[in-house]
């Protein structure tokens, strides 16, 4: 299993930085004895055991739990002669749907050339774009992002190889919209709604419009933005990321109707 953490460890309410050399002795001392000789005929009981296990009063780091769950799932699949997908579907009593799921392509700072590559490859959702700086990427009035969304939709509509290619635009703004509008959810929503026409009919998702610095305020602000978008009749969708990491976080954000989508990173 890959004991991997998310890119921004320690930020937005996440577990602290995970360094393998610090945790290998811990795994050898505390986890290895629990794995040797363990029954792996079923995955779910083992996954739940390690997910709730506490050592010295602390839950295992999310990266450790992620790696362990991968290894345990693989072990169950090998032991029972099934694909890992089949194990998950069987144990959660889910249907086996033989269809592809949309893939999200991420450009990083290469937000122009990478988009051309994504268009040619027919990526379902694009481009992330890494809008994490007001001056260079968003603009103090949001003008740079507005121009980018228009360029993005123009590029897709002019360079796509099939009229059936109709991707979703998903842009992560790292809380920068909140910065230029003084964390006012109504002004944030009005700006976000104004981007819809620049997308020229392509579905538009804005991830992390604000970063409130804590979970309760993040839920409050995202809820207000989402409600205002609905009132304005906007089709732009809000994606929660920061402060929405664990299963319980996801429950809390969605119960508050604070967003249209949650950005779930598998190690979280």
Predicted regions and their residues:
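Glycine-rich, mobile lid/loop segments that gate access to catalytic sites or pores
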Residues: 74-78, 82-153
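Catalytic core of soluble alpha/beta enzymes
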Residues: 158-268
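Well-ordered, non-membrane alpha-helical segments in soluble/globular domains
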Residues: 13-27, 139-155, 183-195, 217-227
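Long, contiguous hydrophobic alpha-helical segments, chiefly transmembrane helices and signal peptides
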Residues: 1, 31, 69-73, 81-84, ...
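Structural signal for hydrophobic packing residues in well-ordered secondary-structure cores
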Residues: 31, 35, 39, 68, ...
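Metal- or metallocofactor-binding catalytic centers and their adjacent structured scaffolds
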Residues: 2-82
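Conserved active-site and cofactor/substrate-binding residues in soluble primary-metabolism enzymes
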Residues: 59, 63, 67, 71, ...
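Short, flexible, glycine/charge-rich loop motifs used to bind or transfer phosphoryl groups or to couple energy/partner
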Residues: 66, 113, 252
